[in-house]
Amino acid sequence: LRRFWHTDVPEADRRFLDAFRLSFLLRGINLVDLCALTKIEDDGRIYYHRAKTGGLLSVKVEPEAIDIINRYRGNNLLLNLTETTTYKYFFHRCAQRLKTLIPEPPFNELTYYWARHTWATVAASLDIPRETIAHGLGHRSEYNSVTDIYIKFDERKVDQANRTIIDHILNEEPETAT
């Protein structure tokens, strides 16, 4: 991911790479949810109901994400990624273009979903607790969803985990393909 992060791409493909980067920075947000965001709240967070599960997520928007968001600031939506096209067309083009940005393996099989998978994998490699990773991804507790009603999860744990993951990827030298 480090190599992919530091890759320059043609301007026509930049929005697809930036959508992928935003997904990673926003804890693996799915493309349908990313394209439906409306605003960043005054507390510096985005709140959204995950399309797949309906669960409410709260994500702190880190400065690196703000930089990308500002490039694509929309009128009716937070991002203008789909304001001139349909979501399905953007999703299809994103899937096509991501595979061509770096032609050698494993990048030539890259999908948008890799951002979510990589966020979780990097988190686990950094010994971030499984419960924090699951909460960051919007998964229900592995223990008991009824218990979750009584326990308020401390979002600061996920915020700190996300910052640690971002720093791990962005502040180290990119790896070369072998």
Question: Where does each model-flagged region fall?
Answer:
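Basic, Lys/Arg- and aromatic-enriched nucleic-acid-binding interface segment
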Residues: 1-31, 35
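Short, contiguous acidic/charged loop-to-helix segments that flank catalytic cores in large enzymes
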Residues: 8-11, 47-58, 79-86, 106-114, ...
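Active-site/catalytic core of tyrosine-dependent DNA strand-transfer enzymes
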Residues: 1-2, 62-107
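Acidic, low-complexity interaction regions
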Residues: 85-92, 96-98, 125, 130, ...
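Short, polar N-cap/turn motifs at the start of nucleic acid-interacting alpha helices
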Residues: 39-45, 109, 128-149, 171-178
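Catalytic-site neighborhood detector that most strongly recognizes the C-terminal catalytic loop/helix
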Residues: 50-54, 137-167
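Conserved tyrosine-mediated DNA breakage-rejoining catalytic core shared by Y-recombinases
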Residues: 35-70
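Short, basic (Lys/Arg/His-rich) helix/loop patches that form interaction surfaces
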Residues: 5-13, 92-139, 143
